[in-house]
Amino acid sequence: MGIVTDVCIKRKIRNFVEIAYEGESGCNILIKTDKALNTKFTEAYEACGLKTKEKGKNADSVRIARDYICQNYFDVRTFGAVMSTGDDPCGIVRGPVQINFGKSVDPVLPQEITITRQAVTTESDKANKETEMGKKNFIPYGLYRAEGYVSAMLAQKTGFSEDDLEKLWTAILQMFEHDHSAARGKMCMRKLIVFRHASLLGNAPSAELFDKVTIRRQDGVEVARSWKDYTVDIDRNMPEGVELLEKL
C-alpha cells in the first residue's frame, strides 16, 4: 500500500498559500525554513508589547502572543501548532483542520532507475572519474484517497474563517500544480468532495459520510494504469442537515 503522509499534504498546502496570498494580511506561514521558531515567538511578544524572556510564567502574555500568532499565521489557525518552547512560549493551538494519511486504493509498486550525472562533486573525484551515478525512485501509477476534517468549534477558537476555508479548498485543488518534479510526474487532484454540516457540532458522524464515497476499478481492468481505469461512486442520499459539495 502506498502512503502520502499528513505532513506532506499540509506542506504543499502551506507552500501554495504562501505563494498565492503573499503579502495578504493573516496569510503568513509559521512552519518554514526562514527563521527558528523560538525567534518568531519572541517577535510575537515584541509585536504585542509584552515582556520577553519570562519563559511562560505570565499566562496572559502567553495567551496574547498565541492569539497574535493565530491572527497572523494561516497554518497555525488552520492546522494548529505546539509553540511551548524557548524563552517566549506561545502555548498550544488545536487546529480545526486535520488530515489523515493518503492511502493508495490498490497496491503500488515503487521502482528504481539509475541515472548518470555528467559532473563530479570534488576535485579529488575529478582525477579518477568524469561522471557520477545516482538513483531515482518512482511509481508508475497510483490513485490515493485521503480524508480530512474541519471542526467548526475549534475554528471559532483559532479565528479560522469562511474566507480561510475557501483558501484551503483552493490550495488543495491547486497545490500540485506548483510542486511538479520528475519524480512525482503528473501528480494531481482528481476529486474533492466536501460534506457541509448545518450545525457547529455536526449532523452526522464522519465515518458514515466517508462510507458514501467508494472507489473501484472499472469492470475488466486487472491493473489500473490511469484515472480512467477507476469509477467513483457517490451515495447522494445525505443525512438531514448535511450538504454534499463536489469541489472537483
Task: Give each language-model segment a name.
Residues M1-L248:
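RNA-binding basic/glycine-rich loop and surface signature characteristic of RAMP-family CRISPR effectors
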